[in-house]
A protein has these predicted regions:
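Class I S-adenosyl-L-methionine-dependent methyltransferase catalytic core
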Residues: 1-219
Length: 219
């Protein structure tokens, strides 16, 4: 059973009690809100020209995410979840897509990206800055590009993407605790974030605030 402390993460929800329907915004137009992609994307996310996502790696992991968000998992299998991801990307129609994946979900996510973009590049990466923790970043682009992400830790890769890739705005519809938000904020870029877990989003909001971000809240 998930502990109450685990559900609340670091307790940022007490300071940033984001609720359904609220939008947290920065002066540059960056926004964060609660959303479940199986029910649809926030409209502002569709304005992004770049996407970075790190989706659940399996049906079991996905179910655990919903449990932590105190919600019922609405999909019957992982392929159905991937179909929702693809639909969201099609609605956004970005110039560039970056999808972090693992051994368990790579076989579903690579074909998905290949069906959406004419140019696909796969970087081999690590996570937690541990050489034995392997992951991949699948890059989909409209033109052939190499952003030098091979061999990087995924944390560093996200900061490099936000610093070097010439996008106007980036969205992460699995924002979680806000790695993309932090990287985009540091790079002076606009970001759009959403997640179904309000406690995780509160952590993201807090981390950006600690970097100097000043949030306003609207309904």
């Amino acid at each position: 059973m998930t502990s109450q402390k685990g559900l609340r993460y670091d307790g940022s929800i007490d300071k940033y009690p984001i609720t359904e329907g609220e939008i947290y915004s920065l002066g540059n137009g960056s926004k964060i809100t609660i959303a479940d992609i199986t029910l649809g994307l926030p409209e502002f996310s569709k304005n992004a020209d770049c996407v970075f996502i790190d989706p659940a790696g399996s049906k079991g992991v996905l179910k655990a995410y919903y449990t932590k968000a105190e919600k019922q998992c609405p999909v019957d299998n992982f392929d159905e979840f991937v179909a929702h991801i693809k639909r969201c990307i099609e609605q956004i129609n970005p110039d560039r897509l970056f999808v972090e994946c693992f051994y368990r979900n790579k076989k579903q996510l690579v074909p998905m990206v290949e069906s959406l973009f004419p140019h696909v590049k796969i970087y081999e990466n690590t996570y937690y800055h541990k050489p034995d923790c392997k992951c991949w970043i699948i890059q989909g682009t409209k033109q052939a590009e190499d952003w030098g992400l091979q061999g990087m830790d995924e944390w560093d890769a996200v900061f490099k993407i936000c610093k070097d890739v010439p996008f106007c705005s980036i969205t992460d519809f699995f924002m979680g605790q806000g790695l993309v938000a932090q990287a985009a904020y540091d790079a002076g870029k606009v970001f759009y974030g959403s997640d179904m877990n309000r406690n995780r989003l509160a952590v993201a909001i807090s981390k950006v605030a600690k970097r100097g971000g000043e949030w306003t809240v609207t309904k």
